[in-house]
C-alpha cells in the first residue's frame, strides 16, 4: 500500500495517516533456532490479538501435504518488538517462531566454525552434507548464485518452514486491512472441467 490517506480507522486508531509501503523481511533457517519476520510500515495503534496470529499458524500446520515435522513443531509467535500491550507501536514488528527441531541439528546448523581437526566432527558434517538438488526448488539456482558446496545452505531458507514467518506477518497485515474496512475472501471457482454454480 503506497501513500494512502486514511480516515480515522477505529476507536484504537483515531488519527489520520499517510501510510508507507509494508516491507517484510524473513530470516532464520529451517533447522536453525528460529524463523524471524520483520514487518515494517505498520501504523501505531492497531489492536492485535495474538491468539488470532497463532490460529493462523495452526491453520498453516494443518494444511494438506504437511510433513511429519509438523508433529514436532508447535508454532507460536513470540513478539520481539513493535507490539506493546497488544497495540502496535509503529516500530518495525519483529516476530520469532521457535524451531523445536533445532535441538536435533545443533552441530550441523551451528553458527560457529567447527573443529575441522576433529574426525568425528568431519564425519558428522560429511554425513549430513547435501549434494543433490530437489526438483522444483531454489536449490540449484541458489547454489550457483552463492557458490555453495553444500546444498543445505540454500535449502534451509528455501523451505516450507519459512512460510511460518510469512503467515505470522500476514496475520498482522490482515488486522491492518480489517481496520481499513477491507475483507479478503476467496473460493474455488473451477478445478479442471468441474465448476461451482
What positions do the PLM features span?
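Generic N-terminal targeting/processing segments that precede catalytic cores or assembly contacts
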Residues: 17-197
Amino acid at each position: 500500500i503506497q501513500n494512502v490517506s486514511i480516515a480515522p480507522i477505529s476507536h484504537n486508531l483515531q488519527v489520520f495517516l499517510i501510510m508507507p509501503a509494508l516491507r517484510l523481511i524473513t530470516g532464520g533457517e529451517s533447522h536453525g533456532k528460529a524463523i524471524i519476520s520483520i514487518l515494517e510500515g505498520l501504523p501505531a495503534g492497531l489492536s492485535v490479538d495474538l491468539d488470532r496470529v497463532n490460529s493462523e499458524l495452526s491453520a498453516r500446520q494443518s494444511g494438506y501435504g504437511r510433513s511429519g515435522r509438523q508433529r514436532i513443531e508447535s508454532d507460536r509467535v513470540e513478539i520481539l518488538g513493535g507490539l506493546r500491550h497488544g497495540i502496535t507501536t509503529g516500530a518495525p514488528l519483529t516476530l520469532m517462531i521457535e524451531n523445536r527441531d533445532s535441538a536435533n541439528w545443533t552441530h550441523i546448523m551451528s553458527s560457529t566454525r567447527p573443529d575441522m581437526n576433529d574426525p568425528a566432527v568431519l564425519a558428522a558434517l560429511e554425513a549430513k552434507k547435501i549434494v543433490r538438488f530437489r526438483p522444483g526448488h531454489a536449490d540449484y539456482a541458489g547454489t550457483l548464485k552463492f557458490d555453495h558446496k553444500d546444498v543445505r545452505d540454500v535449502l534451509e531458507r528455501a523451505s516450507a518452514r519459512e512460510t511460518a514467518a510469512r503467515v505470522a506477518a500476514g496475520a498482522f497485515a490482515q488486522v491492518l486491512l480489517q481496520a481499513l474496512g477491507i475483507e479478503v475472501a476467496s473460493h474455488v471457482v473451477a478445478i479442471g472441467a468441474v465448476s461451482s454454480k
